[in-house]
Amino acid sequence: LDGEDGRKRIDAFLLPGHVAVVLGLEPFRFLAREYGRPAVVGGFEPADILSALCLMVGMLREGKPAVGNTYIRAVHEEGSPQARHVMETVFSVADARWRGLGLIPDSGLALRGEWRDFDAMEKLGLELEETKPIPGCRCGDILRGVLTPEKCPLFGRVCTPQNPTGPCMVSTEGSCAA
């Protein structure tokens, strides 16, 4: 969360509402507890995002990191126990490769053994190809907070929401297109 030069790179976290709907708030509490950073669950509408940012700024100004929730119409403290139970029954934690970041241990999910018959990759004998870096794309640095989107040499030129080059621009919710 801090840069190699000791400066803070990430001040706070805008947490994903769709994940918190299932998991609740507890899995995010370590951000405030261990790293001293505010973290707020927000929805996807502009007013939802603004509301989450306002709460986040208040926490930063007061110097009181916590986990907040402004997406109360969908996210509850405990999440969805039923959905979590299904996830835990069908999936196990696995290493995952993330566009722009590479392999992150224990950051993904894989079908448990008894569900492997439903694994299309295994069933069809497919393997994911290693993704090649995109020349000039700085998505990894943007996702880590090292660069802002407009500092990427591709941003707004060859990489736009209509013609995304890297993973940061692949949707209107991406870190560059949002």
Where do the language-model regions lie?
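Cysteine-cluster motifs in flexible loop/terminal segments that predominantly coordinate metals
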Residues: L128-A178
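Internal helical hairpin/lid segments
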Residues: S51-D141
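Solvent-exposed alpha-helices and their adjacent loops that cap or buttress functional pockets
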Residues: D2-A12, F30-E34, E129-T131, R144-G145, ...
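Charged/polar, solvent-exposed surface patches and flexible loops
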Residues: D2, R29, R33, G58, ...
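Short, composition-biased local secondary-structure segments
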Residues: L1-D2, F118
